[in-house]
Amino acid sequence: MFRAQQNAFDDAVAKATDENLTSENWEYILDVCDKVAAEESGAKDAVAAMIKRLAHRNANVQLYTLELANALAQNCGPKIHRELASRSFTDALLRLANDRNTHQQVKSKILERMHDWTRMFSSNPDFGIMEQAYMKLKTQNPNLQPPSKPVKKEITQADRQKEEEELQMALALSIREKSDAGPAPQAESSAPASAPVSQTQAAAPQAVPSGTSAATVSRVRALFDFQPSEPGELQFRKGDIIAVLESVYKDWWKGSLRGQTGIFPLNYVEKLPDPTVEELQREAQMEADVFGQIKNVEKLLTLLSTRSSELNVQDNEEITALYHSTLAIRPKLIELIGKYSQKKDEFTQLNEKFIKARRDYESLLEASMSHPPQPQYARPGQPPYGYPAPTGPHGYPQGAPQPDPQRYFSPRPQDQTHMYPPTSQSPDPRGRTPPAGPTMQQQQQQPPAESFQPMHHRPESTYDNPQELGTSVYDSPVEYPPANQRFQYPPGASAPPGVHQQLQQQQQEYSPSNYSPEDTTNPPTANFPPQPQQSQLPYPTGPAGHQAPPSHQPPPVPGGASKPSPYPSLTPGAPSAGEYQAYNPSQASASSNPASFYR
């Protein structure tokens, strides 16, 4: 006759906290928030609907209900705050948290949300019921709330030394146990009463003393859920077994879990001793029992698939016996699946790291093979054209330092060709008169600056002797040397003014530092064929672009019976009839015939 009034929020709350959801559906949650804000009694009806959902036995429904309540508290203002801080809702939370059948994760979430709501309602003293309920739950269940994360402090040298000492002690204890394990069977057979003592001694190393470093611990078990708040931290849930790798900070270790590596706080885990021999034997026996039931499982499956549906299974003793025998291995099978699933994840992660390392190594190896280091072989740098070369201590042009002849390839002298930079084309210098005497004296006192550098070593030639150079009013026609000794100039260019001295200075046997300025009139002529000594006059100083004086002797006067060779004689001694004598303007009159100087 009298039925409870239907709550308008039951369907909306049930939809937002459905047990079949895989995660929070924020579309449904926001629909509930909008409906609460739109109706006058929306806050009261929504909290009543959530209390019903908290009584559900499904842990997912309980977790979704807590998330819905938190969303309402953040979006619906003081009306929903008052209903959440009511006695009915807080009692429902305490009742669920104190129930032993409630999932541990649900209990932790209740404590977390009550803590958030206490801080949210702290400004209004009328909502103090939530704070009282939170303190009561925290006192009754101290293990629900995870501890605060320790501060990351660098490990000091003393901590490192202590860790090393503990490692050495653990190694010594392990060696002692292995040495004592040898005569154990003989002692057990001769004195059975000593067995309890041996078992006590074997169980003693399982106790982990306080302050143990990561060097002596290989595994830890998580006591609380840990959510990383900074990069590099390891996420885990309560009950996970973490493999310890090393100590990073004073209260933080580095570990590996399900293929992930990161640091974790020590107050969130408990230390686990290494498995003993008995534990390893127990695990091996469990695996043997599981694999021993494979035939029975296959036989049971065959019997059930071949029998007709009308068969009474209860009357068939064989099927019943096989079913009960295989049913006992299911918990062991689930445990082994979890164990080897974790190992598979670890091995898969290790394989991925190895593949990445191998690819990086191969790429670096290919890069180093495709771009080998090039030897730094090059000739010494030459000064650029147009700039004077560095001079020595006595004012002479100083050439580049002589490199090691074994490090560079040098062509044979007869195959070398002298290349000169382009210069401006100069007119035929015949008919020009030398400039005044002071200019010539100044040019003689100061050697011309080097304005170019030949590219190769100049072969030995009689034209290199500066004593063969002369100047006259009439310049004889130029006779070119053989092709293998010809000095090549670019088209439309002539030799720079200082070419003859520069060619002389390029000889390997000649070094400007071997003689002083007093020896300028007689430079060393070693390794040159002896030539007749002739008077030498200074070079004329002309405008830029004038052709340099010839560096060879002119041919004899035409009209002879036989045509003489255009090349100078290499025979030492008296000059021949066709040799050339320099013309001296100071000793000849203006009307003198230049031809009289040919002998």
From Swiss-Prot:
Subcellular location(s) per record: Endosome membrane
Biased composition (Low complexity): 181-210, 438-454, 533-550, 580-599
Biased composition (Pro residues): 381-391
Family annotation (PANTHER family): JAK PATHWAY SIGNAL TRANSDUCTION ADAPTOR MOLECULE
Protein name from the UniProt record: Class E vacuolar protein-sorting machinery protein hse1
Protein family: Belongs to the STAM family.
Domain called UIM: residue spans: 162-181
GO CC term (a single one): ESCRT-0 complex
SUPFAM superfamilies: ENTH/VHS domain, SH3-domain
Top-level taxon: Eukaryota
Keywords on record: Endosome, Membrane, Protein transport, SH3 domain, Transport
SH3 domain mapped to chain residues: 215-274
